[in-house]
């Protein structure tokens, strides 16, 4: 909960981050898992003089799943301002081999307050995939590692956004050498 006052305006924001996770075959090499959760950031009611929106100063970035793409949908509120979001989601993953991990996620995105540039409260659908792998251990020295990361995301925006909305795509690959 966030309670206070700023410039004579009452502040009352809140968030919920709930998750249930199951690991199947924990003794297997693949260690498959699945989870269901919901992330909720209160939104500011446009019909109220109070500010009920969650202030992201107290949130992690990007808190939602794998998303580098979703954070850019908050540009109207200020870049990186996580607020007014209800996001139930499903995720799953496994370890395809000792040095790799694959994760998948899908979420239906909603806006608790209908204050967007569009006519509705449907923020849309999000899907993401992440593959992380250690490519080499000790290539030059005992503690060295070469790691790789591939991330892909898709955001199908809903009626919360303006009519000229388009599907968003994000793809990132990364190589990291640590010593």
Predicted regions and their residues:
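Membrane-embedded beta-strand positions of outer-membrane beta-barrel proteins
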Residues: 34-36, 90-92, 104-106, 148-152, ...
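Extracellular/periplasmic loop regions
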Residues: 2-94
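Repeated loop/turn-to-beta-strand initiation elements of outer-membrane beta-barrel proteins
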Residues: 27-34, 98-102, 136-150
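Outer-membrane beta-barrel architecture
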Residues: 17-22, 91-93, 128-134, 174-176
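Surface-exposed extracellular loop regions of Gram-negative outer-membrane beta-barrel proteins
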Residues: 1-19, 131-139, 143-152
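Residues that define the transmembrane beta-barrel architecture of outer-membrane proteins
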Residues: 10-16, 84-88, 121-127, 165-171
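Predominantly the C-terminal beta-signal and adjacent terminal strand-loop region
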Residues: 136-179
């Amino acid at each position: 909960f966030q309670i206070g006052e700023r410039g004579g305006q009452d502040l009352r924001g809140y968030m919920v981050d709930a998750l249930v996770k199951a690991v199947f075959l924990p003794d297997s090499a693949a260690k498959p898992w699945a989870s269901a959760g919901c992330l909720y950031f209160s939104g500011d009611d446009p019909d109220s003089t109070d500010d009920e929106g969650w202030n992201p100063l107290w949130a992690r970035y990007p808190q939602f799943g794998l998303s580098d793409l979703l954070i850019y949908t908050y540009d109207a509120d200020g870049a990186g301002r996580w607020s007014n979001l209800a996001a139930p989601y499903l995720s799953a993953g496994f370890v395809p081999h000792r040095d790799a991990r694959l994760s998948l996620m899908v979420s239906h995105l909603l806006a608790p307050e209908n204050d967007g540039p569009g006519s509705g409260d449907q923020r849309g659908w999000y899907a993401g995939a992440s593959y992380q792998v250690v490519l080499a251990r000790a290539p030059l020295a005992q503690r060295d590692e070469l790691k790789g990361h591939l991330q892909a995301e898709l955001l199908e925006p809903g009626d919360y956004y303006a009519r000229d909305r388009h599907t968003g795509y994000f793809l990132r690959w990364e190589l990291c050498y640590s010593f």
